[in-house]
């Protein structure tokens, strides 16, 4: 299930960042991002486990993917594509 990221997700997302990126975003960057009026964050959750997340920024009529991460053990299963589809749908709704 893809849903909007909530503040309670941040500790797990910060850990996922470290697994997926050599230059990971800090907890404080993630925290400020979910409160930004320009950013939308989604998580891919299955059986109460967060398997991935993504971030889209919509500004001045344009959408830009900022981040997309899938747990290494769950790659090549289509999770990234599903999150990308959710971001595209959001961007279209927002006029980007």
Label the model's feature ranges:
Residues 4-73, 77, 81-94:
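Acetyl-CoA-dependent GNAT
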């Amino acid at each position: 299930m893809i849903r909007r990221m909530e503040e309670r997700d941040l500790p797990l997302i910060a850990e996922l960042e470290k697994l997926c990126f050599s230059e990971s975003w800090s907890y404080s960057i993630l925290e400020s991002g979910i409160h930004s009026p320009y950013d939308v964050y989604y998580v891919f959750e299955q059986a109460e486990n967060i398997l991935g997340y993504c971030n889209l920024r919509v500004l001045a009529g344009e959408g830009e993917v900022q981040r997309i991460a899938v747990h290494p053990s769950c790659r090549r299963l289509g999770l990234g594509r599903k999150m990308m589809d959710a971001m595209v749908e959001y961007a279209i709704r927002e006029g980007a």
